[in-house]
Swiss-Prot record:
The gene is recN. Belongs to the RecN family. It comes from Haemophilus influenzae (strain ATCC 51907 / DSM 11121 / KW20 / Rd). This is DNA repair protein RecN. ATP binds at G29, E30, T31, G32, A33, G34, K35, S36. May be involved in recombinational repair of damaged DNA.
Length: 558
């Protein structure tokens, strides 16, 4: 709960330091005295936006500090631990501090550690809930009505799961859209690839085939020339009857043999010529073999030349060298396979998106069931409360409209608060039928009921009793006091019938010092509360009757 609030140089507050206790604390004062200024300052500790006008005129900076005492089961206690912001010497204490400079810059601290404004907002949701004087106007908005039903239902885990399931589905839906867009963009490419791959598959060029075809084509196209050249070579080597290398070498070896017998120095020459003769004879035999295998097949040559021509044509089409066409075929196949796999991935993603949507609908259905149950109870409880607030013939209803085909992060429900003000009338939406006073009373009843379901330790009601008076105001005070038995209640009010129900009372006064306006807030003793209430009852002049009435009001409550 909030135990201390210190304010320095904020607006018309020069210095303020108040201590707060359990139960119901009321803040009272004359109209225009600045009763809500402490609540406004407290809002800065919860991360609200700063303005330069917030700094007291003539001062360099304003500073607001709020001290909370936490119980170990409070989510704020665990949040501080997770964020490593706990005071190791006093882990159950949480001090929020905000400094605003005159130039508009600000600093935020939690337990003396610098933090961001968003971190202040995050922890604030576990510490305080402020019910403002404009809540009755918010009551006309369907989104706010849904929020109130959820607050009363007290199913935060279900709301978190709803948001998570919705986000999961939304992410998958976006992925599907992206995939489908890419698939559409790739369709033309896929069709072209399929045609190209089919064409190359049918052509079926083997690795190195083109080079082999070139060699074979050269051989076949030169067969006549090869035959002629081979015959000419054979003539010179051995087949010319007049003169040939074989016979000449043979005759030479005979002469050298005789020389070697006469002179051993010719032995080496003898060996060389014998080797040469063997080489010539082997070469002759090889040429004879090769020439006998020379093909002259015009049809085969035509087929090979046609295959080469087709290869060159395909290579030009794909803008590669003929010898690289096989590798190009592999690349195109790989790209086509990737696009086909991409289409399969899209189908898998669509199936995932479908399952996520079904899961989201299931969570939305569970959320609807919880809301329907709490909506019935809320309507009954609000009806009971507003009857106590001088709306004896009124009936309050909560209509829940569900469309599982239009699920959002908040579920599939649309809430409408309706009211039957008088007997014999049909219920109508609040915006069409409720007066300002009725809205204030309904709003207050709902705020008390929904706050009662909350685990937040401190509830602030900032002039929520606008538009009511007399006996109705007394009932409001009683409701707030009952609520303070379960949590700390801070109430800004101008009604004595509400103020008298407080366990503690603070009075706000506005005065002038050195031509500068200041506001101060003072904690009142029980004795001091009597004239303060009397002033609320009778204005600036406090009569004996007003004092007696004020004392009686306090006696009846306490």
């Amino acid at each position: 709960m909030l135990t201390q609030l210190t304010i320095n140089n904020f607006a018309i507050v020069r210095q303020l330091d108040i201590e707060l206790a359990k139960g119901m604390s009321v803040i009272t004062g004359e109209t225009g005295a600045g009763k809500s200024i402490a609540i406004d300052a407290l809002g800065l500790c919860f991360g609200q936006r700063v303005e330069t006008s917030m700094v007291r005129e003539g001062q360099e900076r304003a500073e607001i500090c709020a001290t909370f005492q936490l119980e170990s089961q409070n989510p704020a206690y665990h949040w501080l631990s997770e964020q490593e912001l706990q005071d190791p010497d006093n882990p159950t204490e949480c001090i929020l501090r905000r400094i605003i400079n005159a130039d508009g810059r600000s600093k935020a601290f939690i337990n003396s550690t610098p933090v961001s404004a968003s971190q202040l907002k995050e922890i604030a949701q576990y510490l305080v809930h402020i019910n403002g004087q404009h809540a009755s106007q918010l009551l006309l908005k369907n989104d706010y009505q849904l929020q109130l039903v959820d607050n009363f239902a007290a199913h935060p885990e279900l709301l978190v799961k709803m948001r998570e399931d919705y986000q999961t589905w939304k992410n998958l839906q976006n992925q599907v859209k992206t995939f489908q867009q890419k698939v559409a963009e790739n369709e033309a490419r896929k069709q072209l690839l399929q045609y190209q791959v089919d064409e190359l598959d049918e052509f079926n060029l083997r690795p190195n085939e083109y080079l082999e075809l070139e060699d074979e084509q050269r051989r076949l196209s030169s067969s006549e020339q090869l035959t002629q050249l081979s015959q000419s070579a054979l003539q010179i080597l051995s087949e010319n009857d007049t003169v040939n290398i074989d016979s000449l070498l043979y005759r030479a070896t005979q002469y050298i043999d005789e020389l070697a017998e006469l002179d051993p120095q010719y032995a080496e020459v003898q060996n060389m010529l014998n080797d040469a003769l063997i080489q010539v004879q082997e070469a002759t035999s090889e040429v004879q073999n090769l020439s006998s295998n020379i093909e002259q097949d015009p049809q085969l040559l035509q087929e090979i030349e046609q295959r080469i021509s087709q290869t060159l044509q395909l290579a030009r089409k794909h803008q590669v060298k003929p010898e690289d066409l096989v590798e190009q075929h592999k690349k195109l196949k790989a790209e086509l396979t990737a696009l086909l796999d991409f289409s399969e991935s899209e189908e898998m993603l669509i199936e995932q998106e479908k399952r996520a949507f079904e899961q989201m609908q299931a969570t939305a259905t569970a959320l609807t069931a919880s809301r329907q149950q709490s909506a019935t109870r809320l309507a009954q409880n609000v009806t009971q409360s507003i009857k106590q607030l001088a709306m004896e013939n009124a009936e309050f209803y909560v209509e829940l409209n569900t469309d599982l085909d239009k699920v959002s992060a908040n579920g599939a429900d649309n809430v409408i608060f309706t009211l039957r003000s008088n007997l014999g009338q049909q219920p109508q939406p609040l915006a069409k039928i409720a007066s300002g006073g009725e809205l204030s009373r309904i709003s207050l009843a709902i705020q008390v009921l929904t706050s009662d379901q909350s685990a937040i330790p401190t509830l602030i009601f900032d002039e929520v009793d606008v538009g009511i008076s007399g006996k109705t105001a007394s009932v409001v005070g009683k409701l707030l006091r009952q609520l303070s038995e379960r949590c700390q209640v801070l109430c800004v009010t101008h009604l004595p019938q509400v103020a008298c129900h407080g366990h503690h009372q603070f009075n706000v006064e506005k005065f002038t010092v050195d031509n500068k306006t200041e506001t101060k807030m003072t904690a009142l003793s029980q004795a001091e509360r009597v004239p303060a209430l009397a002033r609320l009852l009778g204005g600036s002049e406090i009569t004996e009757l007003a004092l007696a009435n004020a004392q009686e009001m306090l006696d009846l409550v306490h």
